[in-house]
């Protein structure tokens, strides 16, 4: 990543003592480290502790190790169902997301200890009015998804079927799916808008961002085929010119937007493995990831994004019973089905695969900026250094 401090310069040799004077006594600590030692230290450490690139690499390795260990334990405890990838029940979703969340939290906590940060809240969770932003995010997520469903129904691209649940089951499955999607929100936002967005912001520039995104696109070209990959390519290309202009103009806060370009593209990338995803759905995942980055910038934390993400998924999967990234849940309240042209209905991808989702995401972004954009949250730039203890 971009150097955070300049490499140390060789120190001048001390003057010889005058005749008749005793040479000053020096302790071992008075002697400077050999250049080789200081050079190695500079490679790994910057003014804010562990450099961003090494921090991200450590985080990725730890999260993979923790997820593997937890997955093995949960499987042995028979908490993950039959192991069928298409099994989409509230209990399986809850425990699967619990693995991801615990692995992410454990990895972030260990990296935080290495970086001497005071708590996990240092990663874009410290901002003002946290609970207000969280609950307003819940409202925004449900309202945005409802607007999308309403638009699809109005256009004749979605039909409502019978209500699938009744009595106590409505509350039972509603609560179970709410718990599962809260974990989804905490895991995915915790990974992308909290840890990665925070860490990349303190150590990235345009060329590093371009290199990361180029590597992601090369990986797709070499290993993954299908329609969905074009969503990643499209979003990566969309961010290229704005980020380059920010770079050449040396705009304040440029690193935040370079990081947002990277984390949002990666967010689209991880959704390619979902069942039934088309390129619109992948592009929409990256686009909503960018909206969540904007929410971090204008509210001062990721709490709005966590709430919005959880409520969007809950409304889509449980309340309306639509496919979520190609998966239809067991135990949903309403029943809906796509009708007509896949570009408008979303087909097997669900509402997120419809062109209408891009309009809804755009409106959500406009509303977010209109409501919060003129307010001044706690500075994210100062938050980069504040949590580090000496």
Place the predicted regions along the sequence by residue.
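Membrane-interface helix caps and helix-loop-helix hairpins in membrane proteins
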Residues: 163, 222-230, 249-250, 270-279
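Mid-bilayer segments of alpha-helical transmembrane spans in multi-pass integral membrane proteins
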Residues: 138, 142-151, 181-182, 186
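Functionally important transmembrane alpha-helices
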Residues: 281-343
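Small-polar-interrupted transmembrane alpha-helices in polytopic inner-membrane proteins
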Residues: 145, 177, 181, 210-220, ...
